[in-house]
Amino acid sequence: MIQHMRRLEVVALAMATLLVGSTALAKSEKVAFKDARLKIEVNDTDGDAGVQVFLDSDPWQWIEITDPNGRRLLRSTTRGSFAKQGGTELFMESGEPSFDEVPLEEFLARFPEGEYDFRGEGNDGEEFFGTATFSHDIPDGPALVGPHEGGALVDPDNAVVEWGPVDPPNGSPIIAYQVLVVLGNTGLPALPKITLDVMMPPTATSLAVPPGFLRRDTLYEWEVLAIEEGGNQTLSSSFFRTAP
């Protein structure tokens, strides 16, 4: 009987060791981020620049980003109820001081070209990892053909915005133009702006605004962003008013 009990103890210990080992293995599992991007956005109209971060993963407890020199640029950690849920997607944009305050050359020196490492820990202990290639290939701002602020009133049912093509920066192809038409200051806290946001192919130089989107006798801002292959983008913006 005693020998039988000892055998059971040995079996139980072996099973416990196996379970602990399996749990440790699961907790050290390495999982790639679903999305990990870092890009520059230049505002050619206002004369400023900033960096944007995008990432996506299963729920995480913390994430961090380091630059090509190994310096940590960002760390985000969940706390309280958020820690119980975990984080998933994250979008963050740096401040955008004007070029009078921080010239473009100084801005680029703060964020060197190269590989930026993304790391994190998941809710179940898994290790998230990813890499974003960051370049200084910055496109010019699109030349806006029209309509322009102070110009003729725009028919809200037949509105077309136009821009000129942008040359590839340092040979990096333009892959798309993002076009936004924005009604600001709606007065609704849950919907402060109403935005038409369309991604156009690199061959496009105009967009017809869908009838029914624009209100009459209303001021709108519109932007066009030229996006190069690495993700960097430069925008130009203007305003127009619709006819009564």
Predicted feature residues:
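Conserved structural position at the C-terminal beta-strand
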Residues: 120-122, 226
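Short S/T/G- and acidic-enriched coil/turn segments that sit immediately N-terminal to beta-strands
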Residues: 196-197, 202-210
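Extracellular Ig-like/FN3 beta-sandwich strand-entry sites
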Residues: 111-115, 217-219
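Beta-strand-rich modules
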Residues: 212-232
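Extracellular fibronectin type III
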Residues: 128, 227-244
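Solvent-exposed loop/turn segments flanking beta-strands in beta-repeat/beta-sandwich domains
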Residues: 54-74, 167-192, 218-219
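Long, polar/Ser/Thr-enriched low-complexity segments
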Residues: 27-102
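Short, compositionally biased P/S/T/A/G/V-rich stretches that sit at domain boundaries
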Residues: 27-43, 132-166
